[in-house]
Amino acid sequence: MGVVTKKILILGSTGSIGTQALDVIADNSDKFEVVGIAAGGSQPDLVISQAQQLGLAADKVAVADAQAAAVISKALGGEIISGTDAAKILVETTKADTVLNALVGSLGLAATLATLESGAHLALANKESLVAGGEFVTSKAKLGQIIPVDSEHSAMAQCLRSGTRDEVARIVLTASGGPFRGWTREKMWEVTPEQAAAHPTWAMGQMNTLNSATLINKGLELIEATLLFETDADLIDVTVHPQSIIHSMITFTDGATIAQASPPSMKLPIALALDWPHRVPKAQPALDFTAAHTWAFEPVDDAAFPAVQLARHVAKQKGTYPAVYNAANEEAAEAFLRGRIKFPQIVDVVDEVLQGASQFAGVASHVDDILATESEARARANALINRLATNL
């Protein structure tokens, strides 16, 4: 009997996760077959190259940007799927075993919901869609349907196989600390977008790198962990581990702590998510334990980086509060990149929007509730940004 290949859809094919996923698939063509790709459209030439190398028909390519779509359609000799719902439409019209959602931001929510509706496994790198959708998203998922791609949550899933749910005492989420580890809040007022784009251990896209610098990314991951593993936020510790070798740890009720350790590369969690629960041989080089290593751990400086504690509060509130946290951050982060606000003001904006969230945030019974909450959060964030920008 021949080996059955898994049919994979890649959403966000031109980004860091998407390109690495395509590398993993190319190295394991006996295991995986790409049946469609989606991207925003900022790199049309790369989309064309990917589609041609994969032998995809035009109708198995989706791009959000209309101008880029026209260029790509011409090159591929047929009309591709285009528009803001392009990725969602691709999911709905393409049969796949696994959909890798590596889109950026809460725009990935529609594709996440479409994947869950289709019955395909969701390899989720787009944490924002889970954070924004919260319990509304998890309620749509079958048991085991969502497979985390984030290295931290992939590590948690691996460690959890060492015991039962009742035996888990605490989850330990590790953070590199970002490029400004050890800096005071006062010093960070001088941070430039260029400095924030330089991560010490990981190669990521611009927004993820900035979110790592503010530790908003770690806040999103804390919220994500409560949803994926149905865990109370107070049972999750966050520790700074500058080497980014240990990706997460689980402490069990008997006092044992199981850690997942590997070099800082996304190829291992990507490969594991694509073929879960099986491991893909040689997904990445292993650590050499015959060489000397020094691993350090230190507490998060909550005064300099309040994003994690803010996320813990948000996770406890549940409902659409996480959607407010994410949407306000997306607007504030973009404002910083455009030079409209200072680096510490990113989290300040998120905090202030959350303080007024009781007026518009609540429990989501429909996707429109999430979208309405996001829209209000963005409007409030931008109003605050406009006030701050006039004082710079």
Swiss-Prot record:
Signal peptide: none annotated. Its EC number is 1.1.1.267. Pfam families: DXP_redisom_C (PF08436), DXP_reductoisom (PF02670), DXPR_C (PF13288). It catalyses: 2-C-methyl-D-erythritol 4-phosphate + NADP(+) = 1-deoxy-D-xylulose 5-phosphate + NADPH + H(+). GO terms for molecular function: 1-deoxy-D-xylulose-5-phosphate reductoisomerase activity; manganese ion binding; NADPH binding. It is an enzyme of class 1 (oxidoreductase). Pathway: Isoprenoid biosynthesis; isopentenyl diphosphate biosynthesis via DXP pathway; isopentenyl diphosphate from 1-deoxy-D-xylulose 5-phosphate: step 1/6. 1-deoxy-D-xylulose 5-phosphate binds at residues 127, 151-152, 176, 199, 212, 217-218, 221. InterPro entries: DXP_reductoisomerase, DXP_reductoisomerase_C, DXP_reductoisomerase_N, DXPR_C, DXPR_C_sf, NAD(P)-bd_dom_sf. Keywords: Isoprene biosynthesis, Manganese, Metal-binding, NADP, Oxidoreductase. Its cofactor is Mg(2+); Mn(2+). Belongs to the DXR family. HAMAP family: DXP_reductoisom. This is 1-deoxy-D-xylulose 5-phosphate reductoisomerase.
